[in-house]
């Protein structure tokens, strides 16, 4: 009897082990939900959008004090609209996403999220984000956010199955967040009052952002050209497997960024801003030249990573070297 009791105690796992075993599925489930949410909203893209909106608001405000409550509200609303557009994009592309290894695990492509639930998130995010940008900023900024959504979801996404020109259209959608920030910071009113300097700087920054996207996305298109081909997406590296046209567009865009850097620096008279932006653009040109000559995965990967550094430098210089701001006093 004593032996049986002893064996029973030996065979029975401690209560803490049972508790740990019961907790593991819940932890794994939470991680899975967080991973799915991250894939749906694509936080890195959303962060890039928010940085551009903030930079535009900062440049537009000039020497005026920013309303930081408005800034936070506009950024939050923009992030929600961006998340909505990302989910809508994945709904429309769920069939092609299943054909590519890099996107096959997305929640909609893998069937972990229903279309109905996804559309509810899209509608709620669009309405909520639009309203937030309107309340925190103004109606014009909210309409710019709506136009960005329409261009990305309604034009760029279907064009990927039709023509390589999709990149040029997608770059417009990628640069439009600059307009959200400019409108939210009362850029049109300043323009009507005769102050064109801030608007010129913002326009130059928007142009830089538009041009920046060509080398960036051509590098991605080259690295995943086989997957895009399997999904029958009309990327330039699919329709022209040699990569010459993709390399040419990358190099032309990078070259055009150098004079635009000067236009961005003129309003503030900041030599440091011009030199920083021009130097970053020159490096971008050199890396694009390397890709044009080699047209291999290594040169494309170097171009891709360089593009991220160039974007960071451009946005940082736009904020750091622009007109000084008054950061004290009332923010309301």
PLM features: what roles do these ranges have?
Residues 94, 102-142, 241-266:
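Multi-pass membrane catalytic core of lipid/isoprenoid biosynthesis enzymes
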Residues 285-313:
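Interfacial loop-to-transmembrane junctions
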Residues 1-95, 118:
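Topogenic membrane-insertion module of multi-pass membrane proteins
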Residues 51-59, 63-94, 102, 126, ...:
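Membrane-embedded alpha-helical segments that form the functional core of polytopic membrane enzymes
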Residues 17-32, 92-113, 218-245:
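Cytosolic, membrane-interface loops and tails of multi-pass inner-membrane proteins
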Residues 115-187:
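Intramembrane alpha-helical segments
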Residues 316-332:
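Juxtamembrane boundary at the C-terminal end of a transmembrane helix
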């Amino acid at each position: 009897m004593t032996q049986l009791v002893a064996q029973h105690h030996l065979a029975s796992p401690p209560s803490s082990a049972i508790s740990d075993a019961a907790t593991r599925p819940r932890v794994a489930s939470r991680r899975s939900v967080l991973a799915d949410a991250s894939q749906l909203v694509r936080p890195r893209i959303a962060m890039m959008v928010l940085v551009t909106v903030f930079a535009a608001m900062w440049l537009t405000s000039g020497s005026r004090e920013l309303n930081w409550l408005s800034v936070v509200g506009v950024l939050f609303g923009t992030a929600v609209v961006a998340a909505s557009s990302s989910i809508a994009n994945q709904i429309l592309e769920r069939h092609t996403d299943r054909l590519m290894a890099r996107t096959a695990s997305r929640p909609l492509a893998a069937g972990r999220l229903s279309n109905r639930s996804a559309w509810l998130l899209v509608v709620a995010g669009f309405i909520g984000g639009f309203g937030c940008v309107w309340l925190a900023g103004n109606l014009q900024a909210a309409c710019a956010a709506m136009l960005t959504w329409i261009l990305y979801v309604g034009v760029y996404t279907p064009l990927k199955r039709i023509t390589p020109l999709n990149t040029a259209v997608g770059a417009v959608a990628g640069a439009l967040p600059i307009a959200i920030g400019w409108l939210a910071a009362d850029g049109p009113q300043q323009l009507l009052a005769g102050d064109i300097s801030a608007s010129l700087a913002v326009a130059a920054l928007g142009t830089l952002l538009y041009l920046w996207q060509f080398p960036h996305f051509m590098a991605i298109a080259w690295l995943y050209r086989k997957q895009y081909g399997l999904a029958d997406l009309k990327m330039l590296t699919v329709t022209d497997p040699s990569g010459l046209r993709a390399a040419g567009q990358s190099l032309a865009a990078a070259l055009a960024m150098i004079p635009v850097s000067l236009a961005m620096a003129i309003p503030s008279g900041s030599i440091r801003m011009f030199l920083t932006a021009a130097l970053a653009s020159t490096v971008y040109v050199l890396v694009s030249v390397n890709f044009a000559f080699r047209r291999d995965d290594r040169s494309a990967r170097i171009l891709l990573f360089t593009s991220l550094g160039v974007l960071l430098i451009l946005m940082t210089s736009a904020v750091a070297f622009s007109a000084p701001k008054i950061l004290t006093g009332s923010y309301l």
